[in-house]
Amino acid sequence: MKKFVSVVAAAALVAGMATSCQKHNTLTKAEQAEGWQLLFDGETLNGWRSFNETELKGGWGVVDGCIQASGEGGDASGYIVTDKKYANFELVWDWKLTHGGNSGMLYHVVEHPKFKVPYVTGPEYQLIDNAGWEKVNAPSKLEEWQK
């Protein structure tokens, strides 16, 4: 059976998302009245689980009120999804990246055993440290046949 999940947080192997945040998530009374919902309570990972799993596996935590990836694990194990499904939404979030970090947020992904990673089923909002990326991940010198 296919499960549709609308919001996925993705982390690259060497990137940790947030390193510090100012304050836990809150909604004003007006935002609550308009139907806004928080995906993260600022303290726990309640409401989140690993992609294609029923519970949250390792590699994620809450540090200083922010969801943070440890940067450990392989490509197929670094993704978390919300327990709830969302169809019509506006997604707003704050982020910080480590130097040379590469991470992102995927959305409208499909969970199914035939899909080992969410990025084959949904678009990604890429978060990358452009200034630090080149130094950390410098390309190899082109070989003659590539010129």
Q: For each predicted feature, which ranges?
A:
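Bacterial Sec-dependent N-terminal signal peptides
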Residues: 1-26
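Carbohydrate-interacting regions of secretory-pathway proteins
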Residues: 19-147
